[in-house]
């Protein structure tokens, strides 16, 4: 009976050890994949179109603001037949960024008071 119990404990220990190593391998693969995605994002970010510049050549090339990506907005100017596209920030996202900035400042003040 003791040998069966000892064998069971040994089996569970080996199984948990092999599972832990497999999870470490998966975690390492996820970290490598994440790093490669970040490198690609940094490379892509260098070629973005700034706010209020023409984005008609690539409508997905607008730069990111502090929290959100700007949107390529196209319109026809008054009295013109040519379509004009520029990178702009939608108003609702602008207000959300302002609110987030104020909340961040307020959080800093609270931290200073109680920190």
From Swiss-Prot:
Proregion residues excised on maturation: 21-44
Pfam family for this entry, one: Toxin_35
Gene Ontology annotations for the cellular component aspect, listed alphabetically: extracellular region
Alphabetical UniProt keywords: Disulfide bond, Knottin, Secreted, Signal, Toxin
InterPro entries: Spider_toxin_CSTX_knottin, Spider_toxin_CSTX_Knottin_CS
Subcellular location: Secreted
GO terms, molecular function: toxin activity
Range of residues in the leader sequence: 1-20
UniProt keyword rRNA-binding, yes or no: no
Tissue expression from the record: Expressed by the venom gland.
Disulfide pattern: 48-63, 55-72, 62-87, 74-85
UniProt similarity note: Belongs to the neurotoxin 19 (CSTX) family. 01 subfamily.
Free-text comment about domains: The presence of a 'disulfide through disulfide knot' structurally defines this protein as a knottin.
The name this protein goes by in its record: U3-lycotoxin-Ls1k
Species lineage: Eukaryota, Metazoa, Ecdysozoa, Arthropoda, Chelicerata
């Amino acid at each position: 009976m003791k040998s069966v119990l000892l064998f069971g404990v040994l089996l569970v220990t080996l199984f948990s050890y092999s599972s832990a190593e497999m999870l470490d391998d998966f975690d390492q693969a996820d970290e490598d994949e994440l790093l490669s995605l970040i490198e690609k994002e940094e490379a892509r970010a260098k070629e973005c179109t700034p706010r209020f510049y023409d984005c008609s050549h690539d409508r997905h090339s607008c730069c990111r603001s502090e929290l959100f990506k700007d949107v390529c907005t196209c319109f026809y100017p008054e009295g013109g037949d040519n379509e004009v596209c520029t990178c702009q920030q939608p108003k609702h996202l602008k207000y959300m960024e302002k609110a987030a900035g104020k909340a961040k400042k307020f959080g800093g003040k609270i931290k200073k008071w109680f920190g």
